[in-house]
């Protein structure tokens, strides 16, 4: 987002000709640290929706596991550290924990304000599902994650960060 661009930490996934990438590289390097050339025009979009589909699966699975632990009496910070250092370790546990109060810079500790909106995740998951349909690719995990995010958005959380999927699993 804006903070990433200002800090020069964005990741760019680019599709297009080598010549176009050479021309765009100085601008991209001013805002990002990772620039990937995915292939021809359109390849960057495909790579992005694949990445975001995986991210939605990881985030919803992380939120579900954290809630199971909390509901069984575990401290979410302790469980997060155990999973982070074990085979369940993933990006959400490393830098974007969905459980409030576990990771101060994460949106979960700011009432899920800022970050990547649920509505945008739903859009990208819709694009991923359309691509899967076009290619005949089985995406049962992506489809389930999309259903979870659509339900979460329908519950009024479309305009907050996608890590707020944690709320879908919480008992009030």
PLM region spans:
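Helical "substrate-binding/catalytic lid" subdomain
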Residues: 43-144, 148-172
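Rossmann-fold dinucleotide-binding core
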Residues: 1-52
